[in-house]
Amino acid sequence: MARITVEDCQKRIDNRFLLVQMAIKRVQQYREGYEPLVDSKNKEVVTALREIAAGKVMPEDLALYRPAEGEEMPVAE
Protein backbone atom coordinates (compact mmCIF):
# COMPACT_ATOMS: atom_id res chain seq x y z
CA MET A 1 0.00 0.00 0.00
CA ALA A 2 1.31 3.43 -0.89
CA ARG A 3 2.32 5.79 1.89
CA ILE A 4 0.39 9.01 2.25
CA THR A 5 2.41 12.13 2.87
CA VAL A 6 1.70 15.76 3.53
CA GLU A 7 3.15 16.47 0.08
CA ASP A 8 0.43 14.28 -1.49
CA CYS A 9 -2.22 16.35 0.27
CA GLN A 10 -0.56 19.64 -0.65
CA LYS A 11 -1.28 18.92 -4.30
CA ARG A 12 -4.86 19.82 -3.35
CA ILE A 13 -4.48 22.06 -0.28
CA ASP A 14 -1.48 24.36 -0.52
CA ASN A 15 -1.61 25.73 3.03
CA ARG A 16 -0.08 23.30 5.58
CA PHE A 17 -1.91 24.91 8.48
CA LEU A 18 -5.28 24.54 6.76
CA LEU A 19 -4.38 20.95 5.90
CA VAL A 20 -3.72 20.14 9.57
CA GLN A 21 -6.95 21.85 10.64
CA MET A 22 -8.92 19.86 8.06
CA ALA A 23 -7.37 16.57 9.20
CA ILE A 24 -8.11 17.37 12.87
CA LYS A 25 -11.71 18.28 12.09
CA ARG A 26 -12.16 15.07 10.10
CA VAL A 27 -10.75 12.92 12.95
CA GLN A 28 -13.19 14.62 15.32
CA GLN A 29 -16.01 13.74 12.91
CA TYR A 30 -14.98 10.06 12.93
CA ARG A 31 -15.13 10.10 16.71
CA GLU A 32 -18.65 11.56 16.51
CA GLY A 33 -19.72 8.63 14.32
CA TYR A 34 -19.12 9.82 10.76
CA GLU A 35 -18.03 7.11 8.33
CA PRO A 36 -14.74 7.38 6.36
CA LEU A 37 -15.11 8.35 2.70
CA VAL A 38 -12.27 6.08 1.54
CA ASP A 39 -11.45 2.46 2.31
CA SER A 40 -8.69 2.45 4.89
CA LYS A 41 -7.61 0.23 7.74
CA ASN A 42 -5.20 2.88 8.97
CA LYS A 43 -5.38 5.15 11.98
CA GLU A 44 -7.86 8.02 11.90
CA VAL A 45 -5.28 10.67 10.98
CA VAL A 46 -3.97 8.66 8.02
CA THR A 47 -7.52 8.02 6.83
CA ALA A 48 -8.26 11.76 7.04
CA LEU A 49 -5.15 12.55 5.00
CA ARG A 50 -6.12 9.91 2.43
CA GLU A 51 -9.53 11.56 2.08
CA ILE A 52 -7.94 14.98 1.59
CA ALA A 53 -5.46 13.66 -0.99
CA ALA A 54 -8.32 11.94 -2.84
CA GLY A 55 -10.31 15.18 -2.97
CA LYS A 56 -13.14 13.73 -0.87
CA VAL A 57 -12.84 16.43 1.82
CA MET A 58 -12.95 20.10 0.85
CA PRO A 59 -12.06 23.25 2.79
CA GLU A 60 -14.98 25.51 3.71
CA ASP A 61 -13.49 28.19 1.43
CA LEU A 62 -13.33 26.45 -1.96
CA ALA A 63 -10.94 29.13 -3.24
CA LEU A 64 -8.25 27.31 -1.21
CA TYR A 65 -8.83 24.01 -3.06
CA ARG A 66 -6.88 23.01 -6.17
CA PRO A 67 -8.55 20.34 -8.33
CA ALA A 68 -6.40 17.54 -9.70
CA GLU A 69 -5.38 17.66 -13.33
CA GLY A 70 -8.46 17.03 -15.48
CA GLU A 71 -10.84 17.43 -12.53
CA GLU A 72 -13.46 20.17 -12.44
CA MET A 73 -13.73 22.62 -9.57
CA PRO A 74 -16.56 21.61 -7.19
CA VAL A 75 -19.54 23.94 -6.91
CA ALA A 76 -20.49 25.29 -3.48
CA GLU A 77 -24.01 24.35 -2.42
Swiss-Prot record:
Pfam families: RNA_pol_Rpb6. GO terms for biological process: DNA-templated transcription. It is an enzyme of class 2 (transferase). GO terms for molecular function: DNA binding; DNA-directed RNA polymerase activity. The keyword Acyltransferase does not apply. Its EC number is 2.7.7.6. Keywords: DNA-directed RNA polymerase, Nucleotidyltransferase, Transcription, Transferase. It catalyses: RNA(n) + a ribonucleoside 5'-triphosphate = RNA(n+1) + diphosphate. GO terms for cellular component: DNA-directed RNA polymerase complex. SMART domains: RNA_pol_Rpb6 (SM01409). HAMAP family: RNApol_bact_RpoZ. Promotes RNA polymerase assembly. Latches the N- and C-terminal regions of the beta' subunit thereby facilitating its interaction with the beta and alpha subunits. PANTHER family: DNA-DIRECTED RNA POLYMERASE SUBUNIT OMEGA. The RNAP catalytic core consists of 2 alpha, 1 beta, 1 beta' and 1 omega subunit. When a sigma factor is associated with the core the holoenzyme is formed, which can initiate transcription. Belongs to the RNA polymerase subunit omega family. This is DNA-directed RNA polymerase subunit omega. The lineage of its organism: Bacteria, Pseudomonadati, Thermodesulfobacteriota, Desulfovibrionia, Desulfovibrionales.
